[in-house]
């Protein structure tokens, strides 16, 4: 059974709403156990427990929040070398479009790669011209169905990669590749 940790920081509640949708998406794959934790509550033990990690941060001047950076420095720093090969992805909410949330996601992915995480983007489209290559991004709270689906799709894909690479469920790979719902006309 795959184990997914969704960790987030939030100032206004918007990134928390995204995190809840990411967790919902991960739970949609049968056999996936999910923990949802605010960055202030997440521990080393949570990270060691998880096979996959979804990290969400509000965008702060185009970057991650200071609390999320502190988590990487103070909590994950103690796990250097122990968490290589876990699977991870990113999501972020900004105050408005163009607020830097894709850059924040890339910052999260960069930090994860430094710890040896295997990171991924999602090639699917959840709406016309609406994709999540670097992670799920939203301006404000996720209101539209495309924004909500982007979060759920990210969590689902994390659970699928964990199932494929950790649990050996290779049959899911062809299902992902051939799913006609991945692309919107």
Curated annotation (Swiss-Prot):
One of its GO terms (cellular component) is membrane. It holds the Pfam family Flavodoxin_1. Low-potential electron donor to a number of redox enzymes. SUPFAM superfamilies: Flavoproteins. Keywords: Electron transport, Flavoprotein, FMN, Transport. GO terms for molecular function: electron transfer activity; FMN binding; NAD(P)H dehydrogenase (quinone) activity. It comes from Aquifex aeolicus (strain VF5). This is Flavodoxin. Its cofactor is FMN. InterPro entries: Flavodoxin/NO_synth, Flavodoxin_CS, Flavoprotein-like_sf. PANTHER family: FLAVODOXIN-RELATED PROTEIN WRBA-RELATED, FLAVOPROTEIN-LIKE PROTEIN YCP4-RELATED. Belongs to the flavodoxin family. Residues 4-159 form the Flavodoxin-like domain.
């Amino acid at each position: 059974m795959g184990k997914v940790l969704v960790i987030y920081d939030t100032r206004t509640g918007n990134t928390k709403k995204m995190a809840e949708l990411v967790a919902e998406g991960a739970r949609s794959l049968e056999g996936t156990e999910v923990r949802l934790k605010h960055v202030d509550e997440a521990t080393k033990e949570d990270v060691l427990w998880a096979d996959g990690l979804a990290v969400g941060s509000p965008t702060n001047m185009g970057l991650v929040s200071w609390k999320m950076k502190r988590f990487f420095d103070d909590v994950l720093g103690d796990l250097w070398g122990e968490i290589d090969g876990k699977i991870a992805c990113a999501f972020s909410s900004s105050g408005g479009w163009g607020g830097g949330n894709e850059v924040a996601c890339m910052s999260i992915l960069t930090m994860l790669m430094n710890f040896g995480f295997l990171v991924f983007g999602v090639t699917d489209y959840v709406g016309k011209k609406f994709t999540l290559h670097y992670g799920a991004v939203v301006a404000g709270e996720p209101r539209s169905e495309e924004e909500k689906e982007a979060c759920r799709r990210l969590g689902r894909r994390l659970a699928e990669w964990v199932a494929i690479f950790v649990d050996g469920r290779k049959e899911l790979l062809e299902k992902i590749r051939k799913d006609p719902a991945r692309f919107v006309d």
